[in-house]
Every structure is written in structure tokens, then in C-alpha cells.
């Protein structure tokens, strides 16, 4: 459960407001690097996560048929990596949304399995929809 913790992003909240709070899970990941269980029940028609820039108005809506989403905020970037046009990737200069199964499923018998056996086919859908909010 996330209610009452800095991990509760069910209502729009700036990530930066919560990322440094005194909370064990944030300390363990040096910030946000966690998996959230989605309440969309695999319905790809439902938005499972939204990011919006208050500066540019760019909005990212994520849709998936997966049961979870990993959110990572560049907690281990240190300025040694560069990207396009020599952009330096500094500490927490990014956010990544990765739709996936629950990461600890091999250790939880009552969770849906993430094991893929020989001959089985794996399919997953994820949509990243960008727009601009003015």
C-alpha cells in the first residue's frame, strides 16, 4: 500500500517533491527505482501512468496490458554519460517508465508467474502517447 507514503502518486504530484523524503524505500533506491502494481487489470484502454512537464506542457500517457510499472529517476547517473549534442546525463536528470510483470514473482507463489517456458510465446503491449497541454 502506498497511501500516506511518499510513494503515493495516485494524484498528480511533482516527483521532486517526494524523491528526497525520509522514507526507507527511497533511501534503498537512492530515490525512485520501484515497481508499482497497477489497478488497470491489464486493460490497455486505461491510462496507467501520466507524466507532465509544468515547464513545456508536454504530457506522456502510458497504457499497458502488464500488471506493473517500474519507475526509475536516474538515481545513479553521475554526469559521465553523454547523449545527443553532447548532453550530459546528470544525477536524476531523467525518468523512465517500464511496464512489466512484478519483479519478485519467482519468490511469490500467489502472484501471477513471469516464467516463460520453452516453446511458450510472450506478448506484451505498451503505448506511450505524447501530447501537449497548454
Residue positions per predicted region:
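Active-site pocket scaffolds in enzymes
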Residues: 2-134
Amino acid at each position: 500500500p502506498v497511501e500516506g507514503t511518499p510513494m503515493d502518486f495516485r494524484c498528480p504530484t511533482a516527483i521532486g517533491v517526494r524523491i528526497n523524503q525520509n522514507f526507507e524505500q527511497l533511501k534503498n533506491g537512492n530515490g525512485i527505482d520501484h515497481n508499482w502494481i497497477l489497478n488497470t487489470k491489464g486493460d490497455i484502454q486505461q491510462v496507467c501512468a501520466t507524466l507532465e512537464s509544468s515547464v513545456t506542457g508536454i504530457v506522456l500517457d502510458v497504457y499497458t496490458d502488464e500488471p506493473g510499472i517500474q519507475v526509475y529517476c536516474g538515481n545513479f547517473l553521475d554526469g559521465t554519460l553523454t547523449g545527443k549534442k553532447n548532453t550530459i546525463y546528470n544525477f536524476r536528470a531523467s525518468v523512465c517508465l517500464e511496464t512489466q510483470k512484478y519483479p519478485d514473482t519467482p519468490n511469490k507463489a500467489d502472484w501471477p508467474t513471469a516464467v516463460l517456458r520453452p516453446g511458450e510465446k510472450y506478448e506484451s503491449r505498451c503505448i506511450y502517447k505524447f501530447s501537449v497541454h497548454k
